[in-house]
């Protein structure tokens, strides 16, 4: 009884000890005109974007928790929300609104829309063996042909999640039937062995 109590007290003491600040979480460099910033760098605020310098050199990446929050809301299907948004919006049932959850199709459409926004578009088809000189001619001629095809693709509805789950159910039923057939076969063999 004493050993678990001592171990848990020791773990709590170790957890509550102050640790040196992590260098990865500290600001990238000293603030111009401040000498104390170089000695005691300030930790980054994860939910706020870093301040933009006077002369933008490169687009800076957003803080880690902000990006993780975006991924969380993306998985929920709410692209319009951000981690900095209030936790209980007016449309949520907990807040008293009459909001409803997105359907699986809408959530999937949101996910794929955000995914396509992040992916770079390919410049040519992978199966075309065109060289650099031929690519310019193909782009000039192929742009007219690709436009109706792109419009046609955009008009087609996305694959329904109902279809996906229907196919999954069918595969599971087939696996279950095969498992029952194997079980019946092994039971027959067992009965033949015992019956002899």
Curated annotation (Swiss-Prot):
It is found in: Secreted. The modification Isoleucine amide is found at residue 194. SMART domains: CRF. Pfam families: CRF (PF00473). Produced by the hypothalamus. Residues 25-153 form a propeptide. Residues 1-24 form the signal peptide. GO terms for biological process: negative regulation of epinephrine secretion; negative regulation of glucagon secretion; positive regulation of cortisol secretion. Its main location: secreted. This is Corticoliberin. It comes from Canis lupus familiaris (Dog). The lineage of its organism: Eukaryota, Metazoa, Chordata, Craniata, Vertebrata.
